[in-house]
């Protein structure tokens, strides 16, 4: 059951799951992009945005959030049943930034959700186009992964902040479907499961009755998704144990944390896709590009080519560095928050620095921030090379990593060794080898101890020139091994607050 995800490409998960050939998949993904682009153009018209304002990433985020909110049925139901003061459950909105008399002004807009849904459906040939919505959710998730470190969330569930490389997709909404599940990291799945088990421990009725049956099947489904991410038999067997537990409790939480730690060395397979902001798709569609006809893939050269020819702007706070803001967004566009920085620097063609060294805060501007001192600048989102996104964790080996992040989760299928700090990881595995899962634990620890520093992952895979669309001449990069490979190194990134 768990392996079915590995047999379908994500483009198929992104579509309706039936097997399609490459051309059909490319057309189908292209159609989704067309829909987002058409919707964005229409929204810019509604809001009377100039071309420059329409290419402002903050405006894009507001418009994306509005349509996601308009289609969030569960939350909409909840808002109608629990009316809160000053919040109209039928409306959605946010800040739109306009250039007035040489200054940036913030304007709070409010729309009927019904109206937004109508515009979205119209842009998508009458469909709800859930795939396009999920695509935008993944873009927001990738941006969060690049901007914030989930230290608090990790500590709250009893995990270690150094495991942040396992947390891809930790802010994705639950309704993000199969495409969303594919991009979630091992740590994210473990955290969701631990939260569930803790609720069960604290609330006697959580697993009982009609609702309890639904809860139970959600629990088993999540266990299976996590199992499908693991690449070794022992890790998978451990997930079977957790899934089959009659009454999940602390033993299961222990097993889950153990399996998450083991994933720092025995990495799980996590999908990566380049999801771009709507303000990239809009202008491309407006210029007459037909994504459905031309075909599009989230895991090949297409997003790189699109970014080479796109102009995106961002608001910049007084003490922020525009180049650093560009790096943040570039990494988010390629789902590369947990990739090795040496490789990212090579692909991008400019040095990619750890989060703590960047003079930039998040992309979104809070409502209480002063607009008088806001400037805007062009985001540099181009790259020197392109590479194929991976959904495997790569095989394992070792190199000294840092205090902040002690492993990577590869984004690109490119030959290199994968840094992780073996001594730090292994130090966490003292003690507990008794209990039902003892043989699996012993086996997992043995495999981790056998992981060799000199082993190369993705052997023979390289990056490609942007002119090499068919990926015929791989260029295998060589790295300076003395350089720091982790993005959240000894980090001081802000916390993500929901």
From Swiss-Prot:
**Subunit note:** Homomultimerizes to form the nucleocapsid. May bind host exportin-1/XPO1. Binds to viral genomic RNA. Protein-RNA contacts are mediated by a combination of electrostatic interactions between positively charged residues and the phosphate backbone and planar interactions between aromatic side chains and bases.
InterPro entries according to UniProt: Flu_NP (IPR002141)
Q: Where is this region: Disordered?
A: 1-21
What does the record list as GO biological process? symbiont entry into host cell; viral penetration into host nucleus
Question: Its gene?
Answer: NP
One cellular component term from this protein's GO annotations in UniProt: host cell
Locations listed in the record: Virion; Host nucleus
Segment forming the signal sequence: none
The protein's name in its UniProt record:
Nucleoprotein
| Modification after translation | Late in virus-infected cells, may be cleaved from a 56-kDa protein to a 53-kDa protein by a cellular caspase. This cleavage might be a marker for the onset of apoptosis in infected cells or have a specific function in virus host interaction.
MF terms from GO for this chain are: RNA binding; structural molecule activity
**Keywords (A to Z) from UniProt:** Capsid protein, Helical capsid protein, Host nucleus, Host-virus interaction, Ribonucleoprotein, RNA-binding, Viral nucleoprotein, Viral penetration into host nucleus, Virion, Virus entry into host cell
Q: Locate the motif Unconventional nuclear localization signal.
A: 1-18
Which family is this protein grouped under? Belongs to the influenza viruses nucleoprotein family.
Where the record places motif Bipartite nuclear localization signal is 198-216
Q: HAMAP family from the entry?
A: INFV_NCAP (MF_04070)
User: Main site of residence?
Assistant: virion
One Pfam family of this protein, by short name?
Flu_NP
Q: Does the keyword Endoplasmic reticulum apply?
A: no
Query: Carries keyword RNA-binding?
Result: yes
> Where are stretches of biased composition, namely Basic and acidic residues?
8-21
Known role: Encapsidates the negative strand viral RNA, protecting it from nucleases. The encapsidated genomic RNA is termed the ribonucleoprotein (RNP) and serves as template for transcription and replication. The RNP needs to be localized in the host nucleus to start an infectious cycle, but is too large to diffuse through the nuclear pore complex. NP comprises at least 2 nuclear localization signals that are responsible for the active RNP import into the nucleus through cellular importin alpha/beta pathway.
């Amino acid at each position: 059951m768990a392996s079915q995800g590995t047999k379908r490409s994500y483009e198929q998960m992104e579509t309706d799951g039936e097997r399609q050939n490459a051309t059909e998949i490319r057309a189908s993904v292209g159609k989704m992009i067309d829909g987002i682009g058409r919707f964005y153009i229409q929204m810019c018209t509604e809001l009377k945005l100039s071309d420059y304002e329409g290419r402002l990433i903050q405006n894009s985020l507001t418009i994306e959030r509005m349509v996601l909110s308009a289609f969030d049925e569960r939350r909409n139901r909840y808002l109608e049943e629990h009316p809160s003061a000053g919040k109209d459950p039928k409306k959605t909105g946010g800040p739109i930034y306009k250039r007035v008399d040489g200054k940036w002004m913030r304007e709070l807009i409010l729309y009927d959700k019904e109206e937004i849904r109508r515009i979205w459906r119209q842009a998508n040939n009458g469909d709800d186009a859930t795939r396009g919505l999920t695509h935008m959710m993944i873009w927001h998730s990738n941006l969060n992964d690049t901007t914030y470190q989930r230290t608090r969330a990790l500590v709250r569930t009893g995990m270690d902040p150094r495991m942040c490389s396992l947390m891809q997709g930790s802010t994705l909404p639950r309704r993000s479907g199969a495409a969303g599940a594919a991009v979630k990291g091992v740590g994210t799945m473990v955290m969701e499961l631990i939260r569930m088990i803790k609720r069960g421990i604290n609330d006697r009725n959580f697993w009982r009755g009609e609702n309890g049956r639904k809860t139970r099947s959600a629990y088993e489904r999540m266990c299976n998704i996590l199992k499908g991410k693991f690449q070794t038999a022992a890790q998978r067997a451990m997930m079977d144990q957790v899934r089959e537990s009659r009454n999940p409790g602390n033993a299961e939480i222990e097993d889950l944390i153990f399996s998450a730690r083991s994933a720092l060395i025995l990495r799980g397979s996590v999908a990566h896709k380049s999801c771009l902001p709507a303000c990239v798709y809009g202008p491309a569609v407006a210029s007459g590009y037909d994504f459905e006809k031309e075909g599009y893939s989230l895991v090949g050269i297409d997003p790189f080519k699109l970014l080479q020819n796109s102009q995106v702007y961002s608001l910049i706070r007084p003490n922020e560095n525009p180049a650093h803001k560009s790096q943040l967004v570039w990494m988010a566009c390629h789902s590369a928050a947990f990739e090795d920085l040496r490789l990212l620097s090579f692909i991008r063609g400019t040095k990619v620095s750890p989060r703590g060294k960047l003079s930039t805060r998040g992309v979104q501007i809070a409502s209480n921030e002063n607009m008088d001192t806001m400037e805007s600048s062009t985001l540099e989102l181009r790259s020197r090379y392109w590479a194929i996104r991976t959904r495997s964790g790569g095989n394992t080996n070792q190199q000294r990593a840092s205090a902040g992040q002690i492993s990577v989760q590869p984004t690109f299928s490119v030959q290199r060794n994968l840094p992780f700090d073996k001594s730090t990881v292994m130090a966490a595995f003292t003690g507990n080898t008794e209990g039902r899962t003892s043989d699996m634990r012993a086996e997992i620890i043995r495999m981790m101890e056998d992981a060799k520093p000199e082993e190369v992952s993705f052997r023979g895979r390289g990056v490609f020139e942007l002119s090499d669309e068919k990926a015929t001449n791989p260029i295998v990069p060589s790295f300076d091994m003395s350089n720091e490979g982790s993005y959240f190194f000894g980090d001081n990134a802000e916390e993500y607050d929901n």
